[in-house]
Protein backbone atom coordinates (compact mmCIF):
# COMPACT_ATOMS: atom_id res chain seq x y z
CA UNK A 1 0.00 0.00 0.00
CA UNK A 2 2.83 2.38 0.87
CA UNK A 3 4.49 2.01 -2.52
CA UNK A 4 1.25 2.47 -4.43
CA UNK A 5 0.89 5.84 -2.71
CA UNK A 6 4.51 6.58 -3.55
CA UNK A 7 3.75 5.88 -7.21
CA UNK A 8 0.94 8.45 -7.13
CA UNK A 9 3.28 10.93 -5.49
CA UNK A 10 5.96 10.17 -8.09
CA UNK A 11 3.54 10.76 -10.96
CA UNK A 12 2.69 14.20 -9.58
CA UNK A 13 6.38 15.03 -9.31
CA UNK A 14 7.08 13.99 -12.90
CA UNK A 15 4.29 16.25 -14.17
CA UNK A 16 6.18 19.35 -13.01
CA UNK A 17 8.00 21.29 -15.71
CA UNK A 18 11.79 21.59 -15.67
CA UNK A 19 12.95 25.03 -14.50
CA UNK A 20 16.34 26.73 -14.59
CA UNK A 21 17.60 30.08 -13.32
CA UNK A 22 15.44 32.72 -11.65
CA UNK A 23 11.66 32.49 -11.62
CA UNK A 24 8.92 34.55 -10.03
CA UNK A 25 6.96 32.29 -7.70
CA UNK A 26 3.55 33.77 -8.40
CA UNK A 27 0.19 31.99 -8.30
CA UNK A 28 1.31 29.72 -11.15
CA UNK A 29 3.98 28.17 -8.93
CA UNK A 30 2.73 25.40 -6.65
CA UNK A 31 5.10 24.32 -3.87
CA UNK A 32 5.26 20.66 -2.92
CA UNK A 33 4.58 21.36 0.77
CA UNK A 34 3.35 24.34 2.74
CA UNK A 35 4.19 25.07 6.37
CA UNK A 36 2.45 27.99 8.09
CA UNK A 37 4.04 28.99 11.38
CA UNK A 38 2.05 30.93 13.96
CA UNK A 39 1.66 31.40 17.71
CA UNK A 40 -1.14 29.67 19.60
CA UNK A 41 -2.20 28.56 23.04
CA UNK A 42 -1.57 24.82 22.97
CA UNK A 43 -2.73 22.08 25.37
CA UNK A 44 0.77 20.83 26.21
CA UNK A 45 1.40 18.14 28.85
CA UNK A 46 -2.16 18.68 30.14
CA UNK A 47 -1.40 22.38 30.66
CA UNK A 48 -1.77 25.41 28.41
CA UNK A 49 1.30 27.07 26.93
CA UNK A 50 1.88 29.66 24.22
CA UNK A 51 3.78 27.75 21.54
CA UNK A 52 5.07 28.41 18.06
CA UNK A 53 3.06 25.92 15.99
CA UNK A 54 3.20 24.57 12.44
CA UNK A 55 -0.07 24.35 10.51
CA UNK A 56 -1.91 24.73 13.79
CA UNK A 57 -0.23 21.99 15.85
CA UNK A 58 2.95 21.05 17.65
CA UNK A 59 4.54 19.01 16.28
CA UNK A 60 3.65 20.04 12.77
CA UNK A 61 2.86 17.72 9.87
CA UNK A 62 5.15 14.89 8.82
CA UNK A 63 6.61 15.73 5.43
CA UNK A 64 7.30 12.73 3.18
CA UNK A 65 9.90 13.19 0.43
CA UNK A 66 10.76 10.95 -2.48
CA UNK A 67 14.52 10.34 -2.79
CA UNK A 68 16.40 11.57 -5.83
CA UNK A 69 13.96 14.44 -6.41
CA UNK A 70 13.81 18.17 -5.93
CA UNK A 71 11.26 19.47 -3.44
CA UNK A 72 10.02 22.99 -2.75
CA UNK A 73 8.76 23.69 0.76
CA UNK A 74 7.10 27.05 1.34
CA UNK A 75 7.39 28.33 4.91
CA UNK A 76 5.12 31.19 5.99
CA UNK A 77 5.92 33.33 9.00
CA UNK A 78 2.43 34.18 10.26
CA UNK A 79 3.79 35.53 13.55
CA UNK A 80 3.39 39.26 14.15
CA UNK A 81 6.60 40.05 15.99
CA UNK A 82 9.09 37.19 15.59
CA UNK A 83 11.58 36.14 12.96
CA UNK A 84 11.59 32.56 11.71
CA UNK A 85 13.79 30.09 9.88
CA UNK A 86 13.48 26.38 9.13
CA UNK A 87 16.32 23.87 9.26
CA UNK A 88 16.09 20.43 7.62
CA UNK A 89 17.90 18.49 10.31
CA UNK A 90 20.15 15.74 8.98
CA UNK A 91 19.62 16.38 5.26
CA UNK A 92 23.25 17.40 4.82
CA UNK A 93 24.41 18.56 1.38
CA UNK A 94 20.83 18.45 0.14
CA UNK A 95 19.67 22.05 -0.12
CA UNK A 96 20.39 25.07 -2.25
CA UNK A 97 22.54 27.93 -0.93
CA UNK A 98 20.67 30.14 1.53
CA UNK A 99 18.36 27.21 2.43
CA UNK A 100 19.99 25.62 5.50
CA UNK A 101 17.78 27.69 7.79
CA UNK A 102 20.55 29.09 10.03
CA UNK A 103 20.11 32.87 10.42
CA UNK A 104 23.66 33.74 11.49
CA UNK A 105 25.31 31.38 9.03
CA UNK A 106 23.47 30.91 5.73
CA UNK A 107 20.40 33.14 5.37
CA UNK A 108 18.45 36.05 6.72
CA UNK A 109 15.49 34.91 8.82
CA UNK A 110 11.98 35.11 7.41
CA UNK A 111 10.43 38.41 8.61
CA UNK A 112 6.92 38.51 10.10
CA UNK A 113 4.26 38.44 7.40
CA UNK A 114 6.59 36.92 4.79
CA UNK A 115 7.33 33.50 3.34
CA UNK A 116 10.39 31.76 1.92
CA UNK A 117 10.57 28.89 -0.56
CA UNK A 118 13.16 26.30 0.48
CA UNK A 119 14.67 24.15 -2.27
CA UNK A 120 15.82 20.66 -1.27
CA UNK A 121 17.30 17.93 -3.44
CA UNK A 122 17.44 14.44 -1.97
CA UNK A 123 19.60 11.63 -3.30
CA UNK A 124 18.51 7.97 -3.63
CA UNK A 125 20.73 7.03 -0.67
CA UNK A 126 19.05 9.59 1.63
CA UNK A 127 16.16 7.30 2.63
CA UNK A 128 15.62 7.65 6.35
CA UNK A 129 14.23 9.63 9.26
CA UNK A 130 14.91 13.34 9.71
CA UNK A 131 13.02 16.30 11.11
CA UNK A 132 12.60 20.01 10.56
CA UNK A 133 12.70 22.76 13.16
CA UNK A 134 13.12 26.49 13.53
CA UNK A 135 16.65 27.74 14.21
CA UNK A 136 15.58 30.94 16.00
CA UNK A 137 15.75 31.25 19.79
CA UNK A 138 13.78 28.59 21.66
CA UNK A 139 11.24 28.12 18.85
CA UNK A 140 12.44 24.57 18.08
CA UNK A 141 10.81 23.37 21.31
CA UNK A 142 7.48 23.42 19.49
CA UNK A 143 8.14 24.55 15.91
CA UNK A 144 9.16 21.16 14.59
CA UNK A 145 7.91 18.10 12.74
CA UNK A 146 9.00 14.82 11.12
CA UNK A 147 10.74 14.75 7.75
CA UNK A 148 10.78 11.32 6.11
CA UNK A 149 12.71 10.43 2.95
CA UNK A 150 11.16 7.31 1.45
CA UNK A 151 13.23 4.42 0.12
CA UNK A 152 14.22 4.43 -3.53
CA UNK A 153 12.70 1.04 -4.30
CA UNK A 154 12.87 -1.62 -1.60
CA UNK A 155 14.17 -1.15 1.90
CA UNK A 156 16.90 -3.67 2.76
CA UNK A 157 14.80 -4.61 5.78
CA UNK A 158 11.29 -6.05 5.57
CA UNK A 159 8.50 -4.41 7.58
CA UNK A 160 4.73 -4.25 7.27
CA UNK A 161 4.04 -0.70 8.40
CA UNK A 162 5.67 2.18 10.24
CA UNK A 163 5.01 4.59 13.08
CA UNK A 164 6.56 7.96 13.91
CA UNK A 165 7.52 8.63 17.54
CA UNK A 166 8.59 12.26 17.93
CA UNK A 167 9.65 13.38 21.42
CA UNK A 168 9.63 16.97 22.69
CA UNK A 169 10.25 18.79 25.96
CA UNK A 170 7.51 20.76 27.71
CA UNK A 171 8.45 23.85 29.75
CA UNK A 172 6.19 25.98 31.87
CA UNK A 173 8.14 29.18 31.18
CA UNK A 174 7.55 30.97 27.90
CA UNK A 175 10.22 31.03 25.20
CA UNK A 176 10.86 34.74 25.81
CA UNK A 177 11.13 34.32 29.59
CA UNK A 178 13.70 31.56 29.16
CA UNK A 179 15.80 33.59 26.71
CA UNK A 180 15.75 36.63 28.99
CA UNK A 181 16.96 34.55 31.92
CA UNK A 182 19.74 32.90 29.92
CA UNK A 183 21.10 36.16 28.51
CA UNK A 184 20.81 38.30 31.64
CA UNK A 185 23.81 39.20 33.80
CA UNK A 186 21.59 37.86 36.60
CA UNK A 187 21.58 34.40 35.05
CA UNK A 188 18.39 32.38 35.46
CA UNK A 189 18.23 28.80 34.19
CA UNK A 190 15.25 27.69 32.09
CA UNK A 191 14.30 25.12 34.69
CA UNK A 192 14.14 21.41 33.97
CA UNK A 193 11.67 19.81 31.60
CA UNK A 194 8.14 19.68 33.00
CA UNK A 195 7.01 16.89 30.72
CA UNK A 196 8.07 14.76 27.78
CA UNK A 197 5.66 14.84 24.86
CA UNK A 198 5.26 11.94 22.45
CA UNK A 199 3.63 13.09 19.21
CA UNK A 200 2.36 16.18 21.00
CA UNK A 201 0.85 14.40 23.99
CA UNK A 202 2.20 13.98 27.51
CA UNK A 203 1.61 14.65 31.19
CA UNK A 204 3.20 17.27 33.43
CA UNK A 205 4.26 16.18 36.96
CA UNK A 206 1.55 18.55 38.20
CA UNK A 207 -1.14 16.60 36.35
CA UNK A 208 -2.44 13.02 36.27
CA UNK A 209 -3.38 11.11 33.14
CA UNK A 210 -6.94 9.84 32.98
CA UNK A 211 -8.29 6.80 31.17
CA UNK A 212 -8.95 7.52 27.51
CA UNK A 213 -11.84 6.43 25.34
CA UNK A 214 -11.62 3.46 22.97
CA UNK A 215 -10.58 4.27 19.43
CA UNK A 216 -9.37 7.77 20.29
CA UNK A 217 -6.94 9.13 17.68
CA UNK A 218 -3.39 9.77 18.78
CA UNK A 219 -0.14 10.48 17.01
CA UNK A 220 0.22 10.91 13.28
CA UNK A 221 -2.46 9.79 10.83
CA UNK A 222 -0.93 6.68 9.31
CA UNK A 223 -4.03 6.06 7.19
CA UNK A 224 -4.01 9.61 5.79
CA UNK A 225 -0.57 9.58 4.25
CA UNK A 226 -0.25 11.81 1.20
CA UNK A 227 -3.82 13.06 1.51
CA UNK A 228 -4.19 15.04 4.72
CA UNK A 229 -3.20 18.66 5.21
CA UNK A 230 -4.10 20.83 8.17
CA UNK A 231 -4.41 24.52 7.47
CA UNK A 232 -2.96 27.22 9.67
CA UNK A 233 -6.22 27.61 11.54
CA UNK A 234 -6.27 23.90 12.42
CA UNK A 235 -8.96 22.91 9.92
CA UNK A 236 -8.35 20.07 7.49
CA UNK A 237 -8.52 20.44 3.74
CA UNK A 238 -7.22 18.55 0.74
CA UNK A 239 -5.11 21.25 -0.98
CA UNK A 240 -5.64 19.50 -4.33
CA UNK A 241 -2.44 20.82 -5.89
CA UNK A 242 -0.21 20.17 -2.89
CA UNK A 243 1.15 16.93 -1.49
CA UNK A 244 -0.60 15.98 1.71
CA UNK A 245 1.12 15.31 5.00
CA UNK A 246 0.43 13.36 8.18
CA UNK A 247 -0.54 15.48 11.15
CA UNK A 248 -1.30 14.80 14.78
CA UNK A 249 -4.74 15.20 16.26
CA UNK A 250 -4.37 17.90 18.95
CA UNK A 251 -5.05 16.55 22.46
CA UNK A 252 -8.39 17.46 23.98
CA UNK A 253 -7.95 15.68 27.32
CA UNK A 254 -5.22 14.46 29.67
CA UNK A 255 -4.56 10.96 28.33
CA UNK A 256 -1.38 9.10 27.48
CA UNK A 257 -0.05 9.02 23.91
CA UNK A 258 -0.97 5.89 21.97
CA UNK A 259 0.84 3.84 19.33
CA UNK A 260 -1.72 1.61 17.64
CA UNK A 261 -0.46 -1.68 16.18
CA UNK A 262 -1.83 -5.01 14.96
CA UNK A 263 -0.77 -8.49 16.08
CA UNK A 264 1.91 -10.44 14.26
CA UNK A 265 3.38 -7.59 12.24
CA UNK A 266 6.77 -5.92 11.96
CA UNK A 267 6.74 -2.15 12.42
CA UNK A 268 9.42 0.34 11.56
CA UNK A 269 9.40 2.75 14.50
CA UNK A 270 10.95 6.09 13.60
CA UNK A 271 12.23 7.60 16.87
CA UNK A 272 12.92 11.35 16.59
CA UNK A 273 14.67 13.27 19.36
CA UNK A 274 13.15 16.75 18.99
CA UNK A 275 13.81 17.53 22.66
CA UNK A 276 15.48 20.83 23.44
CA UNK A 277 17.13 19.59 26.64
CA UNK A 278 16.41 15.99 27.57
CA UNK A 279 18.36 12.80 26.95
CA UNK A 280 15.89 9.91 27.13
CA UNK A 281 16.11 6.22 27.94
CA UNK A 282 13.06 4.16 27.02
CA UNK A 283 11.71 0.66 26.59
CA UNK A 284 8.48 -1.24 25.90
CA UNK A 285 6.80 -3.40 28.52
CA UNK A 286 7.17 -7.09 27.58
CA UNK A 287 8.65 -6.21 24.14
CA UNK A 288 12.39 -6.64 24.55
CA UNK A 289 13.46 -7.43 20.99
CA UNK A 290 14.16 -4.10 19.29
CA UNK A 291 16.34 -4.11 16.17
CA UNK A 292 18.04 -0.85 15.19
CA UNK A 293 18.49 -0.68 11.41
CA UNK A 294 19.28 2.98 10.83
CA UNK A 295 20.70 5.87 12.85
CA UNK A 296 20.36 9.55 11.89
CA UNK A 297 19.09 8.66 8.41
CA UNK A 298 21.30 8.49 5.32
CA UNK A 299 22.75 5.00 5.76
CA UNK A 300 21.41 1.61 6.84
CA UNK A 301 23.50 -0.18 9.44
CA UNK A 302 24.06 -3.85 10.19
CA UNK A 303 21.20 -4.85 12.55
CA UNK A 304 21.74 -4.21 16.25
CA UNK A 305 19.31 -5.81 18.72
CA UNK A 306 18.66 -4.11 22.06
CA UNK A 307 16.06 -4.09 24.82
CA UNK A 308 15.91 -0.31 25.22
CA UNK A 309 16.55 2.87 23.22
CA UNK A 310 18.54 5.94 24.20
CA UNK A 311 17.63 9.16 22.40
CA UNK A 312 19.30 12.57 22.62
CA UNK A 313 18.18 15.87 21.16
CA UNK A 314 18.68 15.83 17.39
CA UNK A 315 19.14 12.05 17.13
CA UNK A 316 16.99 9.56 15.22
CA UNK A 317 16.82 5.78 15.43
CA UNK A 318 14.85 3.52 13.09
CA UNK A 319 13.85 0.38 14.98
CA UNK A 320 12.06 -2.78 13.89
CA UNK A 321 9.50 -4.04 16.41
CA UNK A 322 7.80 -7.42 15.92
CA UNK A 323 4.43 -7.30 17.65
CA UNK A 324 2.96 -10.22 19.53
CA UNK A 325 0.83 -12.69 17.62
CA UNK A 326 -2.85 -13.13 18.40
CA UNK A 327 -1.98 -16.41 20.11
CA UNK A 328 0.67 -14.73 22.29
CA UNK A 329 -1.84 -12.09 23.32
CA UNK A 330 -4.35 -14.80 24.28
CA UNK A 331 -1.70 -16.63 26.30
CA UNK A 332 -0.98 -13.36 28.07
CA UNK A 333 -4.54 -13.04 29.34
CA UNK A 334 -5.81 -11.15 26.28
CA UNK A 335 -3.79 -8.15 27.35
CA UNK A 336 -3.93 -5.57 24.55
CA UNK A 337 -2.09 -2.56 26.03
CA UNK A 338 1.58 -2.35 26.99
CA UNK A 339 3.43 0.67 28.30
CA UNK A 340 6.26 2.50 26.61
CA UNK A 341 8.23 3.97 29.52
CA UNK A 342 10.64 6.87 28.97
CA UNK A 343 12.88 8.62 31.50
CA UNK A 344 15.28 11.56 31.38
CA UNK A 345 18.94 11.02 32.21
CA UNK A 346 21.87 13.18 33.37
CA UNK A 347 19.64 15.99 34.66
CA UNK A 348 19.10 17.07 38.30
CA UNK A 349 15.31 16.64 38.26
CA UNK A 350 14.49 13.37 36.44
CA UNK A 351 11.16 12.83 34.72
CA UNK A 352 9.34 9.57 33.95
CA UNK A 353 6.55 9.36 31.40
CA UNK A 354 4.54 6.78 29.49
CA UNK A 355 3.00 5.98 26.17
CA UNK A 356 0.76 3.04 25.29
CA UNK A 357 1.34 0.32 22.70
CA UNK A 358 -2.24 -0.71 21.88
CA UNK A 359 -3.31 -3.81 19.95
CA UNK A 360 -7.04 -3.12 19.82
CA UNK A 361 -8.71 0.18 18.94
CA UNK A 362 -11.65 -0.88 21.08
CA UNK A 363 -9.51 -0.92 24.21
CA UNK A 364 -9.65 2.20 26.42
CA UNK A 365 -6.36 4.03 26.87
CA UNK A 366 -5.11 3.20 30.38
CA UNK A 367 -3.94 5.77 32.89
CA UNK A 368 -0.26 5.77 33.87
CA UNK A 369 0.79 2.91 36.17
CA UNK A 370 1.27 3.69 39.86
CA UNK A 371 4.61 1.85 39.88
CA UNK A 372 7.15 1.76 37.02
CA UNK A 373 6.38 -0.79 34.33
CA UNK A 374 10.10 -1.28 33.67
CA UNK A 375 13.47 -0.91 35.35
CA UNK A 376 15.57 1.03 32.87
CA UNK A 377 19.37 1.30 33.17
CA UNK A 378 20.67 4.40 34.92
CA UNK A 379 23.98 4.60 33.04
CA UNK A 380 24.02 6.10 29.56
CA UNK A 381 27.73 6.48 28.74
CA UNK A 382 28.40 3.16 27.04
CA UNK A 383 25.15 2.55 25.19
CA UNK A 384 26.15 1.02 21.83
CA UNK A 385 29.51 2.78 21.62
CA UNK A 386 31.72 1.36 18.84
CA UNK A 387 28.76 -0.75 17.69
CA UNK A 388 27.01 0.68 14.62
CA UNK A 389 28.66 -0.44 11.39
CA UNK A 390 27.54 -0.19 7.74
CA UNK A 391 25.16 -2.77 6.35
CA UNK A 392 27.52 -2.91 3.35
CA UNK A 393 31.05 -2.46 4.83
CA UNK A 394 32.74 -2.50 1.42
CA UNK A 395 31.03 0.79 0.54
CA UNK A 396 32.21 2.61 3.68
CA UNK A 397 34.10 5.86 3.10
CA UNK A 398 35.10 6.31 6.74
CA UNK A 399 38.51 8.06 6.86
CA UNK A 400 41.37 6.19 8.51
CA UNK A 401 43.74 7.72 11.05
CA UNK A 402 46.39 7.96 8.33
CA UNK A 403 44.09 10.07 6.16
CA UNK A 404 43.49 12.69 8.88
CA UNK A 405 45.26 15.93 7.97
CA UNK A 406 44.36 18.02 10.99
CA UNK A 407 42.79 17.68 14.43
CA UNK A 408 40.60 20.42 15.94
CA UNK A 409 39.78 20.28 19.66
CA UNK A 410 36.52 21.96 20.65
CA UNK A 411 37.00 22.31 24.39
CA UNK A 412 33.62 22.92 26.01
CA UNK A 413 33.80 25.47 28.83
CA UNK A 414 31.19 27.18 30.96
CA UNK A 415 32.33 30.48 32.47
CA UNK A 416 31.48 34.13 32.99
CA UNK A 417 32.33 36.29 29.96
CA UNK A 418 34.37 39.21 31.37
CA UNK A 419 33.26 41.48 28.50
CA UNK A 420 29.52 41.14 29.19
CA UNK A 421 29.25 39.67 32.69
CA UNK A 422 27.04 36.90 31.31
CA UNK A 423 27.34 33.17 31.86
CA UNK A 424 28.32 31.62 28.53
CA UNK A 425 29.36 28.37 26.93
CA UNK A 426 32.56 28.39 24.90
CA UNK A 427 33.93 25.98 22.32
CA UNK A 428 37.67 26.19 21.62
CA UNK A 429 37.76 29.29 23.87
CA UNK A 430 35.21 31.14 21.73
CA UNK A 431 31.49 31.81 22.04
CA UNK A 432 29.09 32.31 19.11
CA UNK A 433 25.39 33.13 18.98
CA UNK A 434 22.98 34.38 16.35
CA UNK A 435 23.80 37.88 17.60
CA UNK A 436 27.54 37.55 16.87
CA UNK A 437 27.20 39.00 13.36
CA UNK A 438 25.17 41.78 11.79
CA UNK A 439 24.64 39.70 8.64
CA UNK A 440 24.79 35.99 7.76
CA UNK A 441 28.27 34.68 6.96
CA UNK A 442 27.24 33.23 3.59
CA UNK A 443 25.70 36.54 2.53
CA UNK A 444 28.93 38.30 3.50
CA UNK A 445 31.02 35.89 1.40
CA UNK A 446 28.75 36.39 -1.62
CA UNK A 447 29.03 40.15 -1.24
CA UNK A 448 32.77 40.49 -0.52
CA UNK A 449 34.31 37.26 -1.81
CA UNK A 450 37.77 36.38 -0.47
CA UNK A 451 37.78 39.51 1.72
CA UNK A 452 35.10 37.88 3.88
CA UNK A 453 36.90 34.55 4.19
CA UNK A 454 38.60 33.43 7.42
CA UNK A 455 42.41 33.30 7.53
CA UNK A 456 43.40 29.63 7.40
CA UNK A 457 46.98 30.22 8.60
CA UNK A 458 45.80 32.29 11.55
CA UNK A 459 43.32 29.58 12.52
CA UNK A 460 46.06 26.93 12.67
CA UNK A 461 47.65 28.75 15.61
CA UNK A 462 44.39 29.76 17.32
CA UNK A 463 42.44 26.62 18.27
CA UNK A 464 41.16 26.17 14.71
CA UNK A 465 39.38 29.52 14.28
CA UNK A 466 40.40 32.83 12.76
CA UNK A 467 40.46 35.54 15.48
CA UNK A 468 39.45 38.26 12.99
CA UNK A 469 36.25 36.57 11.78
CA UNK A 470 35.63 33.98 14.54
CA UNK A 471 35.12 31.39 11.79
CA UNK A 472 36.60 27.90 11.50
CA UNK A 473 38.11 27.49 8.00
CA UNK A 474 38.62 24.16 6.27
CA UNK A 475 40.17 23.43 2.91
CA UNK A 476 38.03 21.55 0.43
CA UNK A 477 38.65 17.80 0.73
CA UNK A 478 40.90 17.98 3.79
CA UNK A 479 40.18 15.29 6.37
CA UNK A 480 39.55 16.61 9.86
CA UNK A 481 39.33 14.88 13.19
CA UNK A 482 37.05 17.01 15.34
CA UNK A 483 37.12 16.30 19.07
CA UNK A 484 34.60 17.77 21.51
CA UNK A 485 36.32 17.79 24.90
CA UNK A 486 34.00 18.14 27.89
CA UNK A 487 35.27 19.94 31.01
CA UNK A 488 34.10 20.96 34.47
CA UNK A 489 32.29 24.30 34.81
CA UNK A 490 34.21 27.41 35.92
CA UNK A 491 30.97 29.07 37.06
CA UNK A 492 30.89 29.55 40.83
CA UNK A 493 27.23 28.56 40.93
CA UNK A 494 28.02 25.17 39.38
CA UNK A 495 31.73 24.74 40.07
CA UNK A 496 33.09 21.60 38.40
CA UNK A 497 29.67 20.41 37.21
CA UNK A 498 29.80 18.51 33.91
CA UNK A 499 26.85 18.30 31.54
CA UNK A 500 25.94 15.87 28.75
CA UNK A 501 25.65 17.48 25.31
CA UNK A 502 24.19 16.27 21.99
CA UNK A 503 26.44 17.65 19.22
CA UNK A 504 25.14 18.18 15.69
CA UNK A 505 26.90 19.00 12.41
CA UNK A 506 25.28 20.82 9.51
CA UNK A 507 26.41 20.58 5.90
CA UNK A 508 27.69 17.03 5.84
CA UNK A 509 27.66 13.87 7.89
CA UNK A 510 30.60 12.75 9.98
CA UNK A 511 31.96 9.36 10.96
CA UNK A 512 31.79 8.93 14.72
CA UNK A 513 35.01 7.29 15.97
CA UNK A 514 34.06 6.93 19.60
CA UNK A 515 33.98 8.53 23.02
CA UNK A 516 35.39 8.03 26.47
CA UNK A 517 36.12 9.53 29.89
CA UNK A 518 38.85 12.03 30.70
CA UNK A 519 41.07 13.62 28.06
CA UNK A 520 41.13 12.44 24.46
CA UNK A 521 44.09 10.21 23.64
CA UNK A 522 44.25 9.69 19.85
CA UNK A 523 46.81 6.87 20.06
CA UNK A 524 44.71 4.90 22.52
CA UNK A 525 41.52 5.43 20.52
CA UNK A 526 43.19 4.45 17.24
CA UNK A 527 44.42 1.26 18.88
CA UNK A 528 40.89 0.53 20.10
CA UNK A 529 39.42 1.09 16.64
CA UNK A 530 42.02 -1.23 15.13
CA UNK A 531 41.50 -3.97 17.71
CA UNK A 532 37.75 -3.90 17.13
CA UNK A 533 38.05 -3.68 13.36
CA UNK A 534 35.49 -0.93 13.68
CA UNK A 535 34.22 0.96 10.61
CA UNK A 536 31.69 3.59 11.73
CA UNK A 537 28.54 4.68 9.94
CA UNK A 538 27.63 8.22 8.94
CA UNK A 539 26.02 10.28 11.69
CA UNK A 540 24.95 13.88 12.22
CA UNK A 541 24.27 13.98 15.98
CA UNK A 542 26.11 12.14 18.77
CA UNK A 543 26.42 12.54 22.53
CA UNK A 544 29.25 14.04 24.57
CA UNK A 545 28.72 12.40 27.96
CA UNK A 546 29.65 13.77 31.36
CA UNK A 547 30.97 10.45 32.73
CA UNK A 548 31.67 9.61 36.38
CA UNK A 549 29.58 11.43 38.95
CA UNK A 550 29.16 14.46 36.73
CA UNK A 551 31.62 16.63 38.64
CA UNK A 552 35.36 17.29 38.33
CA UNK A 553 37.65 20.20 39.13
CA UNK A 554 36.81 23.38 37.17
CA UNK A 555 38.31 23.10 33.70
CA UNK A 556 39.38 19.49 34.18
CA UNK A 557 38.76 17.14 31.22
CA UNK A 558 35.74 14.94 31.89
CA UNK A 559 34.94 13.15 28.64
CA UNK A 560 35.24 13.42 24.87
CA UNK A 561 33.64 12.59 21.54
CA UNK A 562 35.60 12.26 18.25
CA UNK A 563 34.48 12.60 14.63
CA UNK A 564 36.21 12.30 11.28
CA UNK A 565 35.03 14.25 8.24
CA UNK A 566 36.26 14.72 4.71
CA UNK A 567 35.31 18.34 4.10
CA UNK A 568 33.88 17.89 0.62
CA UNK A 569 30.84 20.17 0.74
CA UNK A 570 31.90 23.81 0.23
CA UNK A 571 29.77 26.28 2.12
CA UNK A 572 29.03 27.74 5.54
CA UNK A 573 27.98 25.20 8.15
CA UNK A 574 27.36 25.05 11.87
CA UNK A 575 28.61 22.59 14.48
CA UNK A 576 26.84 23.06 17.80
CA UNK A 577 25.33 21.60 20.92
CA UNK A 578 21.67 20.79 20.30
CA UNK A 579 20.48 21.84 23.76
CA UNK A 580 18.65 25.06 22.89
CA UNK A 581 19.64 26.90 26.06
CA UNK A 582 23.31 26.09 25.46
CA UNK A 583 23.06 27.41 21.89
CA UNK A 584 21.64 30.69 23.16
CA UNK A 585 24.53 30.81 25.65
CA UNK A 586 27.08 30.49 22.83
CA UNK A 587 27.77 26.77 22.32
CA UNK A 588 27.94 27.10 18.53
CA UNK A 589 30.66 27.25 15.87
CA UNK A 590 30.59 28.33 12.21
CA UNK A 591 32.72 26.49 9.67
CA UNK A 592 33.65 27.79 6.22
CA UNK A 593 34.58 24.97 3.84
CA UNK A 594 36.48 25.73 0.64
CA UNK A 595 37.47 29.10 -0.79
CA UNK A 596 35.16 31.84 -2.01
CA UNK A 597 35.21 30.48 -5.56
CA UNK A 598 34.02 27.09 -4.28
CA UNK A 599 31.24 28.65 -2.22
CA UNK A 600 29.83 31.32 -4.54
CA UNK A 601 27.84 29.21 -7.00
CA UNK A 602 24.89 31.49 -7.84
CA UNK A 603 25.46 34.38 -10.29
CA UNK A 604 25.70 37.80 -8.65
CA UNK A 605 22.86 39.09 -10.82
CA UNK A 606 20.44 36.82 -8.95
CA UNK A 607 22.24 36.05 -5.68
CA UNK A 608 21.91 39.69 -4.64
CA UNK A 609 18.20 39.01 -4.13
CA UNK A 610 19.27 37.07 -1.02
CA UNK A 611 21.51 39.80 0.42
CA UNK A 612 18.98 41.85 2.40
CA UNK A 613 16.59 41.07 5.23
CA UNK A 614 13.12 40.78 3.71
CA UNK A 615 14.56 41.11 0.17
CA UNK A 616 12.93 40.11 -3.08
CA UNK A 617 13.32 36.35 -2.42
CA UNK A 618 10.89 36.70 0.49
CA UNK A 619 7.26 36.79 -0.58
CA UNK A 620 4.32 38.46 1.15
CA UNK A 621 0.71 39.39 0.43
CA UNK A 622 1.71 41.97 -2.17
CA UNK A 623 4.95 40.58 -3.56
CA UNK A 624 5.72 37.30 -5.34
CA UNK A 625 9.30 36.24 -4.59
CA UNK A 626 12.01 36.07 -7.25
CA UNK A 627 13.69 32.74 -6.57
CA UNK A 628 16.74 31.09 -8.09
CA UNK A 629 16.19 27.45 -9.05
CA UNK A 630 19.45 25.78 -8.09
CA UNK A 631 18.55 22.20 -9.00
CA UNK A 632 16.73 20.78 -12.00
CA UNK A 633 13.79 18.38 -11.92
CA UNK A 634 15.66 15.27 -12.99
CA UNK A 635 14.36 12.46 -10.82
CA UNK A 636 17.11 9.96 -10.00
CA UNK A 637 14.66 7.50 -8.50
CA UNK A 638 12.14 7.25 -11.37
CA UNK A 639 12.73 3.65 -12.40
CA UNK A 640 13.07 2.29 -8.88
CA UNK A 641 10.13 4.24 -7.49
CA UNK A 642 7.75 3.33 -10.28
CA UNK A 643 8.81 -0.25 -10.82
CA UNK A 644 8.67 -1.92 -7.42
CA UNK A 645 5.75 -4.02 -6.31
CA UNK A 646 3.66 -2.92 -3.38
CA UNK A 647 5.03 -5.42 -0.91
CA UNK A 648 8.73 -5.30 -1.79
CA UNK A 649 10.84 -4.26 1.16
CA UNK A 650 7.93 -3.54 3.51
UniProtKB/Swiss-Prot annotation:
UniProt lists the family membership as follows: Belongs to the multicopper oxidase family.
Q: Where does Cu cation 4 bind?
A: 501, 577, 582
Annotated Cu cation 1 binding lies at 87, 504
Q: Which residues are glycosylated?
A: 55, 83, 620
Query: Can you tell me what the entry says about the temperature dependence of activity?
Result: Optimum temperature is 50 degrees Celsius.
In Swiss-Prot or TrEMBL terms, this protein is called Laccase-like multicopper oxidase 1
Q: What is its EC number?
A: 1.-.-.-
PTM comment, free text? N-glycosylation Asn-55 and Asn-83 is involved in folding, conformational stability and laccase activity.
Keywords (A to Z) from UniProt? Copper, Disulfide bond, Glycoprotein, Metal-binding, Oxidoreductase, Repeat, Signal
Instruction: Enumerate the residues binding Cu cation 3.
Output: 135, 506, 576
